[in-house]
């Protein structure tokens, strides 16, 4: 009661914070955590001006008042404690509550469920989510000038577990913490198959790289799925515990079936004395079943035929449990193995210990870098032979360098695989590198050999090849190349000048995917030789940009013609029915795998049939593309930025003005009809949209500031290019 009576002084009068009594300090168990995080323990005994001196550095003091919600109908709040917390200036403003609670010593689960309310002086308090909509706003951007009059009220929920939290209260932070907990039990690919989030979104949320927070609808959907998942998991554990009782040593013949339970319920009401009379000897015979069965559920003496049936059923249950456990522990690698775009590399089987028993060295990352330098192999080759993954994943692992002792399950599996590979003799590793190089140079041979070695595989092997031509620059030492942050602007200017897509430029300039280039231009990290992966990739792009302009244009034209001729060849050879299926399969091209140019046959001479086939309409959106666009609306919203439109255009192989018109039409239906336009199992042609079905400029201004200007510029640019676009340029976009 004493603490509650003093709490209004702290909540309503920021000028009296320095005079808060010592009773307001945090619990003793949290003091060490506070000192470790730099919380000014003596700041309460000094005037506010003393705290302001710390703002010159990298931290900002934030006064936090933590309140515990008991969940009752009266919503009676109990203040736990009030304390200053030093928060880094570069922390995202949306993560302020979570960062402050972690600094105060609270758990990740409590921090994820908390809600923040900010109070500025004597103004009315405002929820933290109402302050700004910018996902990249930092604490310094919002509190740099007003930190001395700001009070951050943090309300803790009474739910001790995430599954007890209502689905309506799930947010981006709770989803991230739940994903981190689930990734300790399974890898990302397995989790993506079960939960309503894609694998790329899971990775982005966990690594805090998702450029926009997940929508509230998606968070609530994930919360409902998480509650069901935990409930099913608890029921599964209970069934396994109950199945342990079904062994012959515990006399399973006395377990009644459902019909007997129903009849016992009736007889228990009619003749309770007779039921008690029969239950006494049975209790003495099966003491192990006493905790889980009440006397009213125990059966009378069973017939010999029923006893034999229940013994046979117990045998069957025990066999099923034994087989399932044996399969779960026999081939753990085979269950989690993913071949990506490659067939597995045949290796000699050696009696080596399994990955689970291999201790990962703390300097595994330096060992990998030393091995790359010693063997003079690329990250792509090492990632392929060491743990059968892509170069992008290896680059991320080496860039983050997470501690193996606290790594997630999926990362630990990859680290153990790399450690296993590095434990091989040096001669053996060099032989594997050579085999991989030969396989990359001769993809057809490797595909035939892998298909013959694994005839049971129903998946068609696809070899990821890097095209070693004279046009593509080869990776060499970039010590004598001067690279600055201006290279990102040069890349964008080059794509705009040559009118090429990100996918085409990434392919010819660095032999990378469109997604990789999109992330590169989005983050624009400062080039430094210390970041070896980024530096080598930028050196490769710099060498390409240093080529004369006419040579670069020739490379663009050859790559575009090669891609176009390959697609047209397959379209001509197929009968009319599977043509639409082919277009759906190629709407998401394999960005990192394309056949070598020198093996591509020349396009066949035009025939009457091929000339009769018209190129597909550039205003039509297929069913598969509709699904991707609707998923984007569900996850991000109806207002994609320029980067998102460019990404969708390259991914769906559609012009930008087609995608822009689709979003304008959807916003029109949401504004005037209150819901999205439904497409009943048919493709959409945006050319059929009427002018009145698109939002006008004034309506755009009311809904989203500045959106119509960007859409207008993009639409005019695409319409100007559309009239003179060649078939090759159409396909490359």
From Swiss-Prot:
One function term, GO molecular function aspect: chromatin binding
Main location: nucleus
Modification Phosphothreonine occurs at: 467
Region (Disordered): 1-47, 435-473, 580-617, 694-733
Positions with biased composition (Acidic residues): 694-708
Annotated Basic and acidic residues bias: 709-733
Maturation and modification: Sumoylated by PIAS1. Sumoylation promotes nuclear localization, but represses transcription factor activity.
Skewed-composition ranges (Low complexity): 441-458, 580-593
Sequence ranges of Polar residues compositional bias: 459-470
DNA-binding region: 350-437, 473-560, 615-674
Positions of the CUTL domain: 161-234
Keyword terms: Chromatin regulator, Chromosomal rearrangement, Developmental protein, Disease variant, DNA-binding, Homeobox, Intellectual disability, Isopeptide bond, Nucleus, Phosphoprotein, Repeat, Repressor, Transcription, Transcription regulation, Ubl conjugation
UniProt subunit comment: Interacts with ATF4 and RUNX2; resulting in enhanced DNA binding and transactivation by these transcription factors. Interacts with PIAS1.
Connected disease: Chromosomal aberrations involving SATB2 are found in isolated cleft palate. Translocation t(2;7); translocation t(2;11).
Record-given protein name: DNA-binding protein SATB2
Gene behind this protein: SATB2
